[in-house]
Amino acid sequence: MEANHQRNDLGLVALTMLAQYHNISLNPEEIKHKFDLDGNGLSLTSWLLAAKSLALKAKHIKKEISRLHLVNLPALVWQDNGKHFLLVKVDTDNNRYLTYNLEQDAPQILSQDEFEACYQGQLILVTSRASVVGQLAKFDFTWFIPAVIKYRKIFLETLIVSIFLQIFALITPLFFQVVMDKVLVHRGFSTLNIITVALAIVIIFEIVLSGLRTYVFSHSTSRIDVELGAKLFRHLLSLPISYFENRRVGDTVARVRELDQIRNFLTGQALTSVLDLLFSFIFFAVMWYYSPKLTLVILGSLPCYILWSIFISPILRRRLDEKFARSADNQAFLVESVTAINMIKAMAVAPQMTDTWDKQLASYVSSSFRVTVLATIGQQGVQLIQKTVMVINLWLGAHLVISGDLSIGQLIAFNMLSGQVIAPVIRLAQLWQDFQQVGISVTRLGDVLNSPTEQYQGKLSLPEIQGDIAFKNIRFRYKPDAPTILNNVNLEIKKGEVIGIVGRSGSGKSTLTKLLQRFYIPENGQVLIDGHDLALADPNWLRRQIGVVLQDNVLLNRSIRENIALSEPGMSMERVIYAAKLAGAHDFISELREGYNTIVGEQGAGLSGGQRQRIAIARALVNNPKILIFDEATSALDYESEHIIMQNMQKICQGRTVILIAHRLSTVKNADRIIVMEKGEIVEQGKHHELLQNSNGLYSYLHQLQLN
């Protein structure tokens, strides 16, 4: 019975965690009620049915350990003894397995032997509909195949032009052969004139067609580049907030800039060289007709080029990886330094920052130099093979001419044809560094484009928000191995109610509002607005109806009017002014020289802190949200600015649900109800005077500290 109970707990915990990973919220008690009918725990069948009810695609498979790196992770390792665990990542290089121990509620790294000892060969693969679509649209080199198919007509035209170019390339050596073997021997001036005119016509057509091919090809690849750039930016803005919190700004910027490498590769000569290489088989047939021996020399050189590239490529890729990492470090440090310039100057730490920059820059230059040296060695190796083949062909060709097996004209024609074959090979070999760089660029961009966006279980047509809020049995932490931030939080807020939330730093106040904005999905429990589970709601629909004012608000480098009307650029001036008056910002805006057309500067640098905050409040109010969140919105203001805002607070709160998070208790003392949080739990709630009556309570303690 105990084993069944344990299996029941672990199966349910696993389903909860996997659903959370796919941005789907669930109520464990409801799942247990529906699918654990006999009370003996979730069987394999009932587990799969429960997953299906959550719009998850779950499949039970048997997989050998050697093939685990091929499956989509995370997955549930199903154990007959009920001791299930999650398989998160397979490190094939070091033969290690990152798992999540559901019994200990902690991540665990297992060696090959440890994993083999506990793995019974059964997996449950879990994906959501959204993630299945994401896998089908996974960004790698195959992403360009649909783009090529889309522009197949243009690429077909390019292919036809390439065929004509190769025909002209085939004709030219034949003209030279005729001149050497016929015209010079028989002194045929009339034939020479005809061949010269014909050759001139061929050259003109070749130049025109070559330019046309480059133009058409560049035009189509530029359109692919535009599509990729647009998709990248849209996807970037659709990523969850956790993606940006777990990465440095400089890293993200560096990955986006990798688009330039792909652009240069697409519009360069590499792809046209591939087309030229495809026609080499025709040239080989003609060359074989001239001299099988000389053709075998050329054919024998091709494996040399391939083997040399195979030898160089892994080393080059490792060094390019290192170069990118150093470049990303520099980018991140530069962004951090520019962002923190006020602090750097205030603390006079420019020498220390410069020293760090010099070291990082030296590291980048060193890694870049190593890439250049290796690329040069690779190119010189290609040149060595080419020159060696040329010498062998010259020696062997001369012998064939002397022995009468080959004419001088045929030897010249053969060398011209071999040049047409080898030239694209050499160009591709020399462009191999670019290809390696593009491979890394695609991988880096894939980190952005393959990251799951904010998804929701279904597109429900939810009505306009009224303002009722409920947190039910909320348990949350930011990462599986991180401490619990919210634990068993239950809170109901009626529409039109003004709620104050206070507590020590790190007590979970701001996290509660982040769950309300659906920045995160709770590990357990539900967040409801007007009775609707936010896990089912479109995040954009939700956030458009919630106004948020933070302690540090960001203004864009635009006019005041554009900042206030950011969510609706075509908004009437009357609405903008009304929101500004409500936020107490209209008077100081009117005193500015350009008024509402004043450019605020980057992040609002041209305004004072109080002015920025009031514009941020106006921006939050302009859409008349039914729910308004003030997260330490007045804590950094001077008393005069705070007084102006607090004077208008009654008008601001009218007709909407308001959540005030503050350290200053004076900000929340007039709230309809005050929630006191401590270590992720609600420890007290009531009105200001009611909470003060409990002299041993946390609120009374904080109030006494502020009075003193």
Curated annotation (Swiss-Prot):
Keyword Nuclease assigned: no
Residue span, Peptidase C39 domain: 1-126
Positions annotated to bind ATP: G503, R504, S505, G506, S507, G508, K509, S510
Gene Ontology biological process terms from the UniProt entry: protein secretion by the type I secretion system; proteolysis
Cellular localization per UniProt: Cell inner membrane
Domain ABC transmembrane type-1: 155-437
Keyword list, A-Z: ATP-binding, Cell inner membrane, Cell membrane, Membrane, Nucleotide-binding, Translocase, Transmembrane, Transmembrane helix, Transport
Cystine crosslinks: none
Family of the protein in this entry: Belongs to the ABC transporter superfamily. Protein-1 exporter (TC 3.A.1.109) family.
Protein name (Swiss-Prot/TrEMBL): Leukotoxin translocation ATP-binding protein LktB
Organism: Mannheimia glucosida
Gene (name only): lktB
